[in-house]
């Protein structure tokens, strides 16, 4: 068998807790469930930063955000940082991105040979936070309670329009690969189809909304009596600390979220169907994941931007050739996917120049053991004036922010993280070990100074660009109408045969 193809189907803001594959009692995710049933489900997979752009840059690069200065949603993803798309292209793969990756900066491809849609979010420095004025909201930043209060049903939104385009463009690219293969191009392919749902706004099409009733929707399982200092800052930042929500509003937003999870799941089904139609399903490893989760009212919090389980954990499912059927309990994270993809593609770590922070998950995916049981997270964006560090090791998760008391949870026995063990005498040794690790790995003050410096630089650059000192970086997919479909310089029969798949091959195939 030839080297397997790789297809990543990526959601935005999808907490695994709200999927059938991970045990939600009413979530309707049949396509994700089917992949989990025949493949490997990773039960302790984390993002490396609970915010869209930095999480995706860690995913693409296999490096923690502090290593590549990818701190927030307006950090440049530098062209000098190798990505898994670069490595796979070097290994002979065709590479394609359809959908969102939130690239910031002039490089809008980062190793993808083809990019078949624009992004849904801006590619400039406008969303740069200011740690010297942490109480000020970013201009045009929409993460507040308005999106919860305005949740509900609509036939169309900018997100629905986008994801429908992403799905179509991804399937068309796969069909073009099949056409090329029929002409003799045997190169394996690697595609990322990256959708915006179920990211807020929590607005769903009637088709998906009607899959659920209000009785299907659980209210948040845990709201603490008092909030830790970091949570208080996030609550202030998203306006949840002073904008009251009714039970009906919370239930409606959670219902719309579940509806959009089902909508995303339908996109997984469409991708699987197309892979089947082009004869590649048996030689394709499909990976389902997300950039981060969504608190969805748990602990009074919404969206992401923290390291509690609903925000920091992500689904991670692999299915395909030589992937075992089962569940992997080891802690892992999105930085592990770059070495995993290199492993799948037949490469080795010898290809890697700058150090990476991940390890290949292929042994776990094959049902083998892995001595590593650790995931690392860093949050360096809005609603905090200092870096926030997370270490998940075994059943324990430690959260550190310089001005705040530490947090330590046993997320296996206490999945709601209701009991902070940081000052529990029975866990004094573990808490001290985690604190020592943080001190050894990170210089908080130096990292903070570096972050503030780049924030200042980016605000200056953005002001200059807004004044006309540069062109916008938003990606425009190339398109030449003179070469599409049938044109007068083409032989109609040749064009018709080019687009037909499977090709005629001299016979009229009715199957």
Protein language model annotation of sequence segments:
Residues 1-401, 406, 415-436, 468-511:
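Formylglycine-dependent sulfatase
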Residues 372, 431, 435-452:
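Bilobed periplasmic-binding protein-like "clamshell/Venus-flytrap" ligand-binding domains
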Residues 412:
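Residues forming the ATP-binding cleft of Hanks-type serine/threonine protein kinase domains
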Residues 447-467:
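Short, charged, surface-exposed hinge/linker loops at domain edges
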